[in-house]
A protein has these predicted regions:
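Conserved acidic residues
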Residues: 113, 127, 199
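A short acidic/basic microdomain associated with nuclease active sites
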Residues: 74-106
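Catalytic cores of nucleic-acid endonucleases
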Residues: 106-108, 122-193
Length: 227
């Protein structure tokens, strides 16, 4: 509730679409209210590890804020009606099939927090999976390594044959990354190089960059690539 209340302030000031670019200040600005809520839960015995709960709230809030703004844009007609979003893509059977890569007898699946997908004639048409990270210190590398594995699985390179790598789905998902970049790691050259593996990357801050898009550009990317 404190996080959503703060987001609504930015929606009021900048509009629904541009509020995507203020998810970082939304999370930072609601920090004190979240701390008060955590103190209350610790006092009531609902949680024991305040630090772990804080990390969990930040991660889940980032996902829920994206989903909230996206659905509000769809409600207003800015997102086509046959495009959907899920914050539980691992439980979606059609998406699960689309993201499964076989390496010998084993399977490899990406780290994905959100999936945005289109449906045409009651069938899954295109899909864009997003890995969300509040910080690049987290598991961003896991996602781009899976994307690289997908490229190998769908190419004619000798590595594919050597390790018996295969991908059985006709349509490949698009793979993206979104961050609020709490610690400004995107300026690290090592992290910058990682972004080239993604079909698109987004940041929830009102900044301009030549290698990562503003999160407010997500709806246009979806319209251009999923229909």
């Amino acid at each position: 509730q404190p996080v959503l209340a703060k987001l609504k302030e930015y929606i009021e000031e900048h509009g629904l679409l541009k509020s995507f670019d203020y998810l970082h200040p939304t999370l930072v600005g609601s920090k004190d209210a979240v701390e008060d809520l955590l103190d209350f839960r610790v006092k009531n015995g609902e949680i024991r590890d305040k630090g772990q709960a804080r990390k969990s709230i930040a991660g889940s809030a980032f996902s829920l804020l994206i989903k909230y703004v996206f659905l509000k844009l769809k409600e207003s007609g800015d997102i086509p009606r046959n495009i959907f979003i899920t914050s539980n893509p691992k439980k979606h059977p059609l998406i699960e099939k689309m993201v499964t890569i076989y390496v010998g007898d084993d399977t490899q699946k990406p780290d994905m927090d959100i999936a945005i997908y289109s449906v045409i004639e009651e069938k899954l048409h295109r899909c864009f999976i997003l890995s969300l990270k509040t910080s690049l210190r987290e598991r961003a590398g896991q996602t781009y390594k899976w994307k690289l594995l997908l490229e190998i699985a769908t190419s004619d390179c000798s590595v594919r044959e050597k390790y018996n790598i295969r991908y059985d789905n006709e349509t490949m998902p698009l793979v993206g990354f979104a961050t609020v970049n709490f610690y400004d790691e995107i300026n690290n050259p090592q992290h910058r190089g990682m972004f080239q593996f993604f079909d698109s990357s987004f940041i929830g801050k009102p900044i301009k960059s030549d290698f990562i898009s503003n999160l407010s550009e997500l709806p246009e990317f979806v319209r251009a690539n999923l229909l």
